Amino acid sequence: MGIKALAGRDLLAIADLTIEEMKSLLQLAADLKSGVLKPHCRKILGLLFYKASTRTRVSFTAAMYQLGGQVLDLNPSVTQVGRGEPIQDTARVLDRYIDILAVRTFKQTDLQTFADHAKMPIINALSDLEHPCQILADLQTIKECFGKLEGLTVTYLGDGNNVAHSLILGGVMMGMTVRVATPKNYEPLAEIVQQAQQIAAPGGKVELTDDPKAAAQGSHILYTDVWASMGQEDLADSRIPIFQPYQINQELLALADPEAIVLHCLPAHRGEEITDAVMEGPQSRLWDQAENRMHAQKALMVALLGLV
């Protein structure tokens, strides 16, 4: 069925997609970016973000405007959901007004509650468990650089957080080796690793280590994120000495494949998880990666709204 099977569905986690559906989404994103396809709609996207956002908010907004639709910013601080209205009530009401809803929240279970009580598609715009929209853009960027995904090795260095979770799942579904290098006690959730082993395409696998240099050796992509996620700001300073060996710098990058690229989902703490020299260097693809958030999310909305 491919892309058409996504019409009316939700995307709460990256593994909500089949391997075929993910490949179709990535191709659709490429076609939208190149202008091969120019769908048009008069749909309304709602953004309900309980956490701060730059790239996700702006890229979703720009994507819907480019499609000819409208966007409502449903800030919890000025809507009743921020004053305690139950999620199920908010979901039922919004379902009568808008066509698709992107939610950035803390609990994955909140996303499921929205999905259970609304007929419109619900998109996970980041939760504490996963960040599927980010990984769609990451995979699009990697494919643009290498012309393929299968057989590549991507190394994630740092905290085993929501981005790491979605990268593990999305990467193995595309037949990639996903190496994750974290300090001890900061590994990705065991259930995510187990799930990845169950859904991996041929050639896809997860490798966990606490050795950043071994993880970087020969890798095609080095990827990092902040060492303390949103809501963990009080832990940031104490984590710096723990995570310092996992910084992507010129020394670590030299261990990777000579044609390796560097990714970061942003925002970055320059000089902590990644150096200025690497961010601004010739192997950095951070700005292409950020741009592709718009194209990947446009493809996702086009598919979920049944516009193709």
From Swiss-Prot:
Residues the record lists as binding carbamoyl phosphate: 53-56, 80, 104, 131-134, 265-266, 293
Organism: Synechocystis sp. (strain ATCC 27184 / PCC 6803 / Kazusa)
UniProt-listed Enzyme Commission number(s): 2.1.3.3
Location of the protein in the cell: Cytoplasm
Protein name in UniProt: Ornithine carbamoyltransferase
Protein family membership: Belongs to the aspartate/ornithine carbamoyltransferase superfamily. OTCase family.
Keywords per UniProt: Amino-acid biosynthesis, Arginine biosynthesis, Cytoplasm, Transferase
Binding site for L-ornithine: 162, 225, 229-230
Coiled coil: none
Keyword Transferase: yes
Family annotation (PROSITE patterns): CARBAMOYLTRANSFERASE
Pathway: Amino-acid biosynthesis; L-arginine biosynthesis; L-arginine from L-ornithine and carbamoyl phosphate: step 1/3
Lineage: Bacteria, Bacillati, Cyanobacteriota, Cyanophyceae, Synechococcales
GO molecular function: amino acid binding; ornithine carbamoyltransferase activity
Flavoprotein listed as a keyword: no
Any one of the GO BP annotations: L-arginine biosynthetic process
